[in-house]
Design a protein with these regions (language model features):
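Amphipathic, Lys/Arg-enriched alpha-helical "gate/interface" segment within cytosolic domains
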Residues: 1-115
Length: 115
């Protein structure tokens, strides 16, 4: 399950239980809609309640990120698991966004907003 919050200069997505390709497509649609209103997007991905993800999510993420290499300013990854932090770092190969990994939501959101 995914919950997406669209705020002025930040799109926040919280993933609960298993992250499915249906959830990911919902996130893609929200990103594309937000990009119609602004040139670059700040994104906060909260993986703290995510139990795992399906393989098709990983593939969809690679395709989507490669098709939007310059559309993100900052991507904050909120997680308590080191391997999810590494996945965020790996995404830097496909985007020129600044990517930060955080364990605390306050600093994650402040950084994602550019503060």
């Amino acid at each position: 399950m995914i919950v997406i919050q669209d705020e002025k200069n930040l799109l926040k997505a919280s993933i609960y239980a298993e992250f499915t390709v249906s959830d990911y497509r919902e996130l893609e649609n929200a990103i594309v809609a937000k990009l119609k209103a602004q040139r670059k997007l700040n994104l906060l991905l909260d993986f703290t309640s995510m139990a795992g993800f399906t393989l098709d999510v990983a593939w969809e993420d690679i395709k989507f990120t490669r098709s939007h290499p310059h559309d993100f300013a900052r991507i904050a990854v909120l997680t308590s698991d080191q391997w999810r932090s590494w996945l965020g770092w790996l995404a830097t190969a496909f985007t020129d966004a600044q990517i930060g990994s955080f364990t605390d939501p306050g600093p994650a959101e402040a950084w994602a907003r550019g503060a």
